[in-house]
């Protein structure tokens, strides 16, 4: 490995969740409300990439003393820290600090992070270690999916038959959260595609579609239609719960 010292502008982007269009607002608000039901005070959260996750987290304002142990730190986590929702005071490890491996967001976020004693950017081997994650207080993994089948399997990588994104640390966080005594592994997605033509809750995936998260690591599925609680349920019970959070026009 080599380290090269060079001057360069920060890589900035519109942070997911800060550019919400009015049409999507009711969906984000509904999902945020359901997430708020599942996330207890003092939980340590991991938030996967994506506009849906970030926008929905804006509705966690009533929560207290949340902590952060995540892969990517974005503007929404900065805002929740500034408003006192995130304090990191109840974390089991790295108390008082948000821990992450990457940053993705605006120039304001980079300035906020600079010399901030309340954050720690560490290597992937440390942050994504399932043992480290599982030790966190009330570890709650919140990850998005492209689609979920009626077994509860999640595809977070393929879109229209092509690789759309990588898996990242999703399996590490989901497995660790599921093994945590007070933890939760949550998958979030809209129930229907933007054009309204296709359900994101599928009877089964198309051939060749990868399973990013197996059904054993998906404990809750949240859409704007509600919460599917899958823990301890049989395949038929899981299917019934997932149909309940599908869009009404696709439930038959």
Write out the residue ranges for each language-model feature.
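Conserved phosphate- and dinucleotide-binding cores of soluble alpha/beta proteins
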Residues: 1-252
């Amino acid at each position: 490995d080599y380290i090269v010292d060079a001057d360069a502008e920060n890589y900035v982007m519109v942070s997911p969740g800060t550019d919400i269009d009015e049409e999507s607002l009711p969906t984000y608000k509904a999902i945020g409300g359901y997430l708020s039901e599942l996330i207890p005070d003092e939980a340590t959260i991991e938030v996967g990439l994506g506009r849906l996750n970030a926008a929905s987290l804006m509705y966690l304002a009533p929560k207290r003393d949340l902590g952060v142990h995540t892969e990517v730190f974005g503007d929404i986590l900065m805002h929740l820290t500034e408003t006192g929702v995130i304090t990191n005071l109840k974390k089991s490890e790295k108390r008082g600090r948000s821990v992450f491996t990457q940053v993705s967001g605006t120039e304001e976020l980079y300035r906020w992070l600079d010399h901030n004693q309340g954050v720690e950017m560490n290597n992937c081997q440390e942050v994504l270690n399932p043992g480290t994650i599982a030790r966190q207080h009330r570890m709650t993994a919140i990850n998005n999916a492209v689609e979920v089948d009626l077994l509860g399997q999640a595809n977070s990588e393929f879109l229209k038959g092509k690789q759309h994104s990588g898996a990242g640390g999703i399996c590490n966080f989901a497995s660790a959260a599921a093994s945590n005594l007070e933890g939760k592994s949550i998958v979030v997605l809209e129930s229907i595609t933007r054009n309204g033509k296709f359900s994101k809750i599928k009877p089964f995936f198309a051939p060749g579609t990868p399973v990013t998260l197996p059904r054993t690591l998906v404990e809750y599925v949240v859409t704007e239609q509600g919460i599917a609680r899958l823990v301890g349920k049989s395949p038929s019970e899981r299917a019934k719960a997932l149909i309940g959070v599908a869009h009404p026009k696709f439930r038959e």
